[in-house]
């Protein structure tokens, strides 16, 4: 049975990859399972300059998920390409670099730098992180800013360009179409929902940054609907993400319209979940006598023309 999928110019051996920010740079997981078995390796967000991130506490468990306010803590581009990239370039054949900037110029700088490295096969633009006061949420919810970022990076970057969208908007299909028209090769849907938790004893917000991004199974129904809606709105591949913790959860995303999927919070719960999921998806195709995982994409839309 065929698990291969195509994202932009890339052919992935299977549709399963980690969500940026939940898998580090892969180094913490390489002794748990062979990362070459993944469809791709998506690393945590890199910015031009080092970021210390938000003040702690940064992570808190909630019902059916978690809320985090990491604040894009990372060592910056120079350290990444000099110290980290040499360590991870052979972990998987398809390395996807997630980048964020505090200005259009910073996105352009990172795209120009990434273009120089053959090891980096694709970029995923983080225009949707809800934890940072500059960039992130502002870009992801400002339609004109989104268009400007994607189009400016597209002019510089010739390899596969993926845009990760925020769900914290009124109609995500408008942003999906804007990203496609600006030059995106694929979309990642979705990032986290903005949320807050309060300690009733201290009567203060628990997170150091007060608010953060909610992820995990609690957001899956909303994520599936957004993939479903965007599948009808755009013609480029969608990478579905949001609360995938089982084979059935993954299948929901494919049926809604996803070509590939990312696993986030579940990596903390079960570090070996992704290789198990890949195996179970293959078994599912065999049991259902489906020749290719690509055949599942968008099947939930069948018959809509008659509704």
Swiss-Prot record:
Q: Which keywords label this protein? A: Cytoplasm, Flavoprotein, FMN, NAD, Oxidoreductase, Pyrimidine biosynthesis
Q: What is this protein called?
A: Dihydroorotate dehydrogenase B (NAD(+)), catalytic subunit
Main localization of the protein described in the UniProt heading = cytoplasm
Residues annotated as binding substrate: 44, 68-72, 126, 191-192
- Per the UniProt record, which residue ranges are transmembrane? none
The cellular location(s) given in this protein's UniProt record come to: Cytoplasm
Catalyzed chemical reaction(s): (S)-dihydroorotate + NAD(+) = orotate + NADH + H(+)
Query: Gene name?
Result: pyrD
């Amino acid at each position: 049975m065929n698990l291969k999928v195509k994202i932009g110019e890339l052919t992935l051996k299977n549709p399963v990859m980690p969500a940026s920010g939940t898998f580090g740079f892969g180094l913490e997981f390489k002794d748990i399972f062979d990362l070459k078995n993944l469809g791709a390796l998506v690393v945590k967000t890199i910015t031009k300059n080092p970021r210390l991130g938000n003040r702690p506490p940064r992570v808190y468990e909630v019902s059916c998920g978690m809320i985090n306010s990491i604040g894009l803590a990372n060592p910056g581009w120079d350290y990444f390409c000099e110290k980290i990239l040499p360590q991870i370039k052979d972990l998987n054949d398809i390395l996807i670099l997630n980048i964020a900037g505090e200005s259009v110029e910073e996105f352009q700088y990172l795209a120009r730098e990434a273009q120089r490295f053959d090891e980096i096969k694709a970029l995923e633009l983080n225009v949707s992180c809800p934890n940072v006061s500059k960039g992130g949420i502002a870009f992801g919810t400002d339609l004109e800013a989104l268009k400007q970022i994607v189009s400016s990076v597209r002019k510089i970057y010739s390899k596969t360009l993926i845009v990760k969208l925020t769900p914290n908007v009124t109609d995500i299909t408008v942003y999906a179409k804007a990203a496609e028209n600006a030059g995106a090769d694929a979309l990642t849907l979705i990032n986290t929902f903005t949320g807050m938790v309060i300690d009733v004893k201290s009567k203060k917000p628990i997170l150091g940054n007060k608010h953060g991004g909610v992820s995990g199974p609690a957001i899956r129904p909303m994520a599936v609907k957004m993939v479903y809606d965007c599948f009808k709105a755009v013609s480029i591949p969608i990478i579905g993400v949001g609360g995938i913790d089982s084979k059935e959860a993954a299948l929901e995303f494919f049926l809604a319209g996803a070509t590939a999927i990312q696993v986030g919070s579940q990596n903390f719960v079960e570090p070996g979940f992704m290789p198990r999921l890949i195996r179970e998806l293959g078994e599912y195709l065999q049991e259902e006598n489906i020749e290719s995982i690509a055949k599942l994409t968008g099947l939930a839309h069948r018959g809509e023309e008659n509704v």
